[in-house]
């Protein structure tokens, strides 16, 4: 909790972007969809270079503002086409982005869109830990890239 209290403070483990000091975080890209494209590129590189029988996964954490960006959607189309089964994106769907409520600017049904792009789609209660664990397990056994749409309430 102390790390979250230091959000966006110099030297914290929860910095602003683009800093990579937090262990396990290879890229902290902020909004505008660059993180989605970067994560898809990392998953492609891992899949192409892996000599191991162990399946490794690339995880993307994205919000409403990220998926509204064309760069994220273009990269997502490629991930579906390439069947990047080692890619799991958690989409925190709280219906809020930097300019306010998403309904003012975006009515996209991302579950339908990602399904059409060849992704394994799951919609869950993003506050329910059991649903999160089960959705991750299901995603790890899919032969497609996975998007877990966690419906959340901001700051809950």
Regions found by a protein language model. Name each.
Residues 1-82:
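Cofactor-binding active-site loop characterized by glycine-rich and histidine/acidic residues
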Residues 81-91, 95-112, 117:
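Phosphate/pyrophosphate-binding betaalpha-module
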Residues 31, 65-66, 100-104, 122-129:
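Hydrophobic alpha-helical scaffolding
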Residues 112-115, 120, 129-156:
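Glycine/aspartate-rich loop-and-adjacent alpha/beta segment that forms the canonical ThDP
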Residues 11-13, 59-69, 92-97, 127-129, ...:
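Acidic, glycine-rich active-site loops and adjacent beta-strand->loop/helix elements
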Residues 56-57, 85, 143-145:
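Short coil/turn segments at beta-strand junctions that form active-site/ligand-binding loops
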Residues 69-94, 132, 147-150:
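A short alpha/beta connector and helix-capping loop motif
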Residues 18-19, 70-74, 98-104, 133-136:
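Short acidic, glycine/serine/threonine-rich loops at helix termini
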């Amino acid at each position: 909790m102390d790390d979250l209290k230091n959000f966006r403070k110099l030297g914290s483990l929860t910095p602003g972007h683009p800093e990579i000091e937090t262990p396990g975080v290879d890229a902290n890209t902020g909004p505008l969809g660059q993180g989605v494209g970067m994560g898809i590129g990392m998953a492609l590189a891992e899949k192409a270079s892996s000599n191991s029988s162990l399946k490794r996964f690339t995880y993307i954490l994205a919000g409403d503002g990220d998926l509204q960006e064309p760069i994220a959607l273009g990269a997502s189309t490629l991930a579906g086409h390439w069947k990047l089964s080692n890619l799991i994106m958690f989409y925190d769907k709280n219906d809020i982005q930097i300019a306010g409520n998403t309904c003012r600017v975006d009515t996209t049904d991302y579950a339908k869109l990602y399904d059409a792009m060849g992704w394994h789609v799951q919609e869950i209660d993003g506050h329910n830990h059991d649903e999160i664990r089960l959705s991750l397990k299901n995603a790890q056994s899919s032969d497609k890239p996975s998007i877990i749409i966690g419906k959340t309430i901001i700051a809950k």
